[in-house]
Amino acid sequence: MQVKNTLIKLLVAAAALFPAAVWAQTSSINAFSPYTMYGIGELNTPGTLPMRSMGGVGVAMRSTGVVNLLNPAAYSSIPQKTFLFNFGLEGQNYYNSQTVAGQSKSTAYNTFNFHDIAFQMPVARKLGLGFSLTPYSSVGYRTKYYHEYDPSDPVWGNVGRVQYNYEGEGDVTEVKLGLGWEVFKNFSVGVAAQYYWGSIDRTFTMTPTAITGEGNYTSSVGLDNYSISSVKGQVGVQWSPVLTQKRILTIGAAFDIGGDLNPEVTKRIYVGDIYNTTVKGDTTHLKMVLPRQLSAGIYYQTAKWAVGVDYAYQNWGDSNTATEMTGVSGSGDARTSYEVAYTNTSTFKVGVEYTPSRYDVRSFLKRWSYRAGFRYGYHNQTFNGDRLAQYAVTAGFGIPVKLWAISSIDVGVEYGRRGYNVAERVGLVRQQYFKFAVGFTLFAGAQENGEYWFSRPKYD
């Protein structure tokens, strides 16, 4: 009876969080960056907070207290009669700077939203199930530029000064369900199905001002809605050639199969008073493909230390060779245009975790886990053929909720930069961001850590 009641309470709590998490993913801006103007926006860093605080490593991670979102083979690590639940929140501060016509301009924006909800549980001996709901990509931007009045121009001399505004917001969410099976001692395989859905709205407004001449010019508004729904799969393996009481060495690899995204795009153009006269409206499908991804990693852990290294490759460029866009930055004489195209990406990650004394009864701080990491790679789009380098430095810590407990409260920070290598040459913004995240990990099970959620009482 106690086991049944505990499971019911836990599932009710998860069900209560699920619609709130979905609402958060579809109702507010999760990113604020001009780099999200194209495609499906900025890709989010996958993984629960302990993984992201270590630079995002995790392909080879096997841990009783961490839901692994990078490799379904890790689901087999969940012990019998246990349940692992995770929930995370994340706040972001974006700072964008740009030099236009010799003048430095900057903007800043803050966001705060849900990041992930996940759980892991055993299905049978050496067989585990994992579920996660996480943001895959985010769109959020507001930008404008001007075409200045030029009396010598035969066209613009009659129109006057024109202001162009671009706005967009939305996101793509990933739902993942998978199984991990320890086929034989120290070797596990996993498979997962991933479903992507979301909606992205983009608005373009042209407003003539200071009109001269005999012409009569009015504003025009373009509204584009991208509706996304797609399925793809993932397979993974993990092997621990060293597995003793004192140290564990695990090698892991995962492959994302990829799949057609092909968002349904509904376009509307209005002229005159806003939303008054529809000039054109149609619905098409944008040819776009989610990339295949190959990732591999090594993870080494002892009683105090854990060190991981990951590498991930995504073939965005090979999958989306026909997807090209154009963009504009600056205003007036300083206005520049560029071509945007997808490119293949490589990302390197390294992370470390240190726990001074996990079972120390005298010092609370010695039971904390301290984490740090680094990530370096490239943006998945090029601008006039130039690739944008991006890197991040991460740190965080995990606080056990009580002595010998696996359940914890996790805190993490991340500082990153993007576009500094080519921003001045191409005319783009130099972007810095700072992220602050809080995660909650709940472990329930009949373990020797005092968390006896699934133990049958002697007298019922």
Question: Where are the regions that the model predicts?
Answer:
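Bacterial Sec-dependent N-terminal signal peptides
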Residues: M1-S28
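Short hydrophobic "helix-edge" motifs at membrane interfaces and signal-peptide entry regions
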Residues: L10, A60-R62, E174-V175
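Generic low-complexity, intrinsically disordered sequence content enriched
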Residues: L11-A15, A21, G58, V235, ...
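Residue-level detector of alpha-helical transmembrane segments in integral membrane proteins
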Residues: V12-A13, G65, T284
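N-terminal, post-signal peptide beta-strand-biased segments of exported outer-membrane/organellar beta-barrel
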Residues: V22-K126, F131-P135
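Outer-membrane beta-barrel porins/channels
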Residues: Q25-P46, M51-R52, P122-D460
